[in-house]
Amino acid sequence: MLCGVHTKSKFSQLKSLAQWNGRDSKPAPVLDALTTRQKLSAEVARLRSVLTQIVATGPAFGHVVALGDFNDGPFADVMEAEFLIGNILDELVGSFLEPNTYFKHAMEPERLSSASTTRFRDPLKGGQFVEELIDHILLSPGIWSGAGRFRLRPNSCVVESVAWDANVEIAQSEKRQNRPSDHKPVSVVIEWDG
């Protein structure tokens, strides 16, 4: 089963570092961002519930690829640290204590640690551009363990930077209309043992 994911970025009133730093005297923007995070978490919890039902039959039967744009909401890192809110990707992959339902990333750890699919100005870093990986391909145990009929081709999960770069108008690449998408695509090869 292919499960296309596009969590909503759920824009909030929290837009600037000044708002974050002023949260004690003017909490409304941060409270709004917390509500946004709760909505994202609820969206992911529901998706996780559905995926668990599908893959709980065991690795030989539950073949699921969950892929797409996993927006993690405004100020995700500081919200997680300040309020002990979980990362939505961590929520979605499940628990290693339930190995028949635990998803893994299709990308090799070495590549995953430096990969990015989007670039944006981060208000927490003075408006500097930062790069992040928010587009992911997650595999159910039936695929990543090799116990089922579908298998991940080793080292096949990549960010398609070359294809994306080939279609960017370099002169004004920061403008959205001069890029093929706001995110670089990610690809993977899944082989069938049929």
Where are these regions (language model features)?
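Metal-dependent phosphoester-hydrolase catalytic domains
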Residues: Q53-V65, F70-G194
